[in-house]
């Protein structure tokens, strides 16, 4: 799938899949919203609005109110690719959220996921 296809996908559809993934593993939407807020600066109500108003996945990240400066601490593999090695900045931001959702689903404590140290 090309980057442009990913960027043009409806945010609501993608985020619903992330919610389902974490809930299948016993985590909550509130925890995913918290991780998303940490990464992007969107409040939970704004995340819901973006899900409902047709915002694209690319625009969700392009318009993020405040990307967390500690996001570069997110490391690891998502879909066989190291997130820290992704060259295209927007795709790296998208994969950061994928990685946070993966860590939630794997049972990692939220405090560690948010890399507040």
Label for each model-derived stretch:
Residues 1-117:
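A charge-rich, low-complexity, intrinsically flexible signal that marks solvent-exposed coils, linkers
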